[in-house]
Structure formats: structure tokens, C-alpha cells
From Swiss-Prot:
Disulfide bonds: none
Source organism of this protein record: Arabidopsis thaliana
The entry's keywords: Glycoprotein, Hydrolase, Lipid degradation, Lipid metabolism, Secreted, Signal
Signal sequence coordinates: 1-29
Positions of glycan attachment: N105, N165, N288
Keyword Secreted: yes
Protein name, per record: GDSL esterase/lipase 22
GO BP: any one term: lipid catabolic process
Gene: GLL22
Residue numbers annotated as active site: S43, D322, H325
Sequence segments annotated as region (Disordered): 372-391
Subunit and interaction comment: Component of the PYK10 complex, at least composed of PYK10/BGLU23, BGLU21, BGLU22, JAL22, JAL23, PBP1/JAL30, PBP2/JAL31, JAL32, JAL33, JAL34, JAL35, GLL22 and GLL23.
GO cellular component terms listed in the entry, alphabetical order: extracellular region; plant-type vacuole; plasmodesma; vacuolar membrane
């Protein structure tokens, strides 16, 4: 009798294990995990749209771009970019397709990001965020239903080109003019996010701006030297970033219970700056110059046919592959932070948590200002800077 009971218990245990593996755990009220990833913004998220939009050949379609994977596919990296890794972590089996290319598979999301994109103005051979949103709306009816869109993640990185252009065109702008411009940019960002929300999107991942003054191309153009960043651009980026969290909090709190606005904010600024100042902790040995390019910081002309650019021997030791874009190694790190880091990096929840958060539930946690830490972005090659946690 005891033997029969043991056999029965064993059979029940096997059935339970098989049931658990066959039916993945889901959050109450959520029948399935996230179904797609949509990205918007500039060259950091461009999956190949620039190649379709421009009438000229783009360097990103040719070697040494894609060097790490022997696949120059129009992405501004030596290999994959952050959304590629994030999609893998989200169990999306397909690469995020460039939406502007014909005959691509957009069944699990699409990239609308284009190199040179801005929030304001009319960029040449590029698109504003508003134009990208309109393109999404044009494609929506034929490709994605409302339930699909509501459960998908919408990821945005935009604004860098606005501030780079403003600084170049207004070198003597005072604090008042800078503040007014930041307000214009962030107000436009809010309007464009609202337009996406009105189209049915509900889950947003907003990436703050990088420390723009520490980009190798900026250091090179403004002759900062090897150990200094251009603080005017960093200040503009910080002013911009400070407005993002409160803006999204307001949008979430004001959204109707029938269509909750859900979001998270990735502190990209400090994620980059930490690796710039504590480079050896992350096994980056060059953070103030590019792997590919020419000039004082090897930051210009990577891949251009009329430029004899230098190319480093080992790109994984560089934080930046070209003058504006991070190496694949760094991009993968950022994707890991987005997907699984704590609230020191991405808040009020990480992307893994956002994907399973019930789409019909209002947010109960919100963005809060980080603990102040005053550290200037100088001496970038040093590993002794203080004031930042390792993330």
C-alpha cells in the first residue's frame, strides 16, 4: 500500500512539473507576455532605416560597421545595438526590423528610428519623432491590432541632435536661452509621446540623453583635450533629463483607469558616465576616443570612402565604436541594465517587470528624483572618480 502511495505521489509530481513547464507563469489579468518591441528615435536605435531614406550610400551599410559579426547591416555599431539585445531578453525570436524598408517582417515589432532624427525642425534625409509616430499610425491598421499594441513596449531615445545643433548654431547662448530651448524640446517630446499613447500604446521605455559633451566627436570638435568633456552640452543634457521623470509621472497619474499609461526611465546619462569615469571596472580601456575614425579623438569619418579612418585592433576595449555610438559590448551592457537592473538605474521598474505588468492596471509606483551627486565629467580615462554606483 505504501509503495502504491509513493508511486502515486511520484506521478503527481511529474504531472505538476510538466504543467509548470508547459504553461509559463503569467501575472494575474495578463494572458500573455509582451508581444513586440517598437523603437523610435535617432541613430542609436536605427536598425537600417537611414539606408532606405537617403539617396546616397551610408557608411553604416559597409565594413567596418558590423565588424564584430561580419555583418554591416546599417546599424551604427560594430555589431548589434541595444534594442537587438533587449528583444532577445524579451524572447522575441526575430530581429527588430527597420520599418522603412519594404517587405520586412514586423510581426514582433519594428524600428522607426532614423539617423539624424530630431524633435524640432525638419532634419534633412531623416525624420522627426512626430513623423515617426505618423509612420507607425500608417502601418498600424494593416499589421497590429489594438490589443497587440497595448501589450507591446515602445522605446524612445531622442533629443541629442536637437542639442548638438543648438549648441553649434548658438555658441553664445546664455542660461535663459538654454532653459527656453530645453523647455521647447521636452514639451515637444511630451506631445509626441501623447500621440503614441493616443494610438493605443501603453508601455513606454524612455532613455535619458547621454552625457553629450563626452562623446568623442564632441571632444574633438570643441578641442576639450583627452581628459575633459564639453560641459555646456552635458549641462543641456542634464536639464533635459531632469524634466523626463516628472513629465511621465504626470502623464501616468492623469491617464484614465480604462487606459493606464505605464512607463519606466533608463538613466542612460549616468550609465555612460560611470563607464567613462570607472572604465577599468567594466574592462573598457579607452573611453575618450573612438575605435574607428580620424582626428584627435579618432571620432570622424568611420567607414566613409573618402576618409582614411583608423580602426582599432580590439573594439571590445572601447566604450565608443565611432564618434557618437557605443561599441556592441557597451550596447549589450545597457540592454542588461534596461531589462534587469534595480531602481538606481531604471525606475520605477525595469523592462522585465514592465512587460508583465497587467496592461489594465494603473501604475502604483512612480519615478523619484535620484539622490544628488555632483561629479563633473572630467578625467574620463581615470578609474578613481567618486560619486557613482557601479552599474
Amino acid at each position: 500500500m505504501m509503495a502504491n502511495n509513493c508511486n502515486l505521489v511520484s506521478v503527481l509530481c511529474v504531472i505538476l512539473v510538466l504543467t509548470l513547464f508547459h504553461n509559463p507563469i503569467t501575472v494575474a489579468g495578463q494572458n500573455s507576455p509582451v508581444v513586440a518591441l517598437f523603437t523610435f528615435g535617432d541613430s542609436n536605435f536605427d536598425a537600417g532605416n537611414k539606408q532606405t531614406l537617403t539617396k546616397t550610400l551610408v557608411a553604416q551599410g559597409f565594413w567596418p560597421y558590423g565588424k564584430s559579426r561580419d555583418d554591416p547591416n546599417g546599424k551604427f555599431s560594430d555589431g548589434l545595438i541595444t534594442p537587438d539585445f533587449l528583444a532577445k531578453f524579451m524572447k522575441i525570436p526575430l530581429a527588430i526590423a527597420p520599418a522603412l524598408q519594404p517587405n520586412v517582417n514586423v510581426s514582433r515589432g519594428a524600428s522607426f528610428a532614423v539617423e539624424g532624427a530630431t524633435l524640432l525642425g525638419a532634419p534633412v534625409e531623416s525624420m522627426t519623432l512626430n513623423q515617426q509616430v505618423k509612420k507607425f499610425n500608417q502601418m498600424k491598421a494593416a499589421n497590429w491590432n489594438d490589443d497587440f499594441v497595448a501589450k507591446s513596449v515602445f522605446m524612445i531615445y531622442i533629443g541629442a541632435n536637437d542639442y548638438l545643433n543648438f549648441t553649434k548654431n548658438n555658441p553664445t547662448a546664455d542660461a535663459s536661452a538654454q532653459q527656453a530651448f530645453v523647455t521647447s524640446v521636452t514639451n515637444k517630446l511630451k506631445n509626441d509621446i501623447s500621440a503614441l499613447y493616443s494610438s493605443g500604446a501603453s508601455k513606454f521605455v524612455i532613455q535619458t540623453l547621454a552625457p553629450l559633451g563626452c562623446l568623442p566627436i564632441v571632444r574633438q570638435e570643441y578641442n576639450t583635450g583627452m581628459d575633459q568633456c564639453y560641459e555646456k552640452l552635458n549641462d543641456l543634457a542634464k536639464q533635459h533629463n531632469e524634466k523626463i521623470g516628472p513629465m511621465l509621472n504626470e502623464m501616468a497619474r492623469n491617464s484614465p483607469a480604462s487606459a493606464p499609461f505605464q512607463f519606466t526611465v533608463f538613466d542612460f546619462y549616468n550609465a555612460v558616465l560611470t563607464r567613462t569615469q570607472r572604465n577599468q571596472n567594466f574592462r573598457f580601456f579607452v573611453t575618450n576616443a573612438s575605435c574607428c575614425g580620424v582626428g584627435s579623438h579618432d571620432a570622424y569619418g568611420c567607414g566613409l570612402p573618402n576618409v582614411h579612418s583608423k580602426l582599432c585592433e580590439y573594439q571590445r576595449s572601447f566604450l565608443f565604436f565611432d564618434g557618437r555610438h557605443n561599441s556592441e559590448k557597451a550596447q549589450e551592457m545597457f540592454a542588461h541594465l534596461l531589462f534587469g537592473a534595480d531602481t538606481n538605474v531604471v525606475q520605477p521598474m525595469n523592462v522585465r517587470e514592465l512587460t508583465v505588468y497587467p496592461v489594465d492596471e494603473p501604475m502604483r509606483e512612480f519615478w523619484v528624483p535620484p539622490t544628488p551627486a555632483t561629479v563633473h565629467a572630467s578625467d574620463s580615462s581615470s578609474s578613481t572618480s567618486r560619486g557613482y554606483e557601479y552599474y
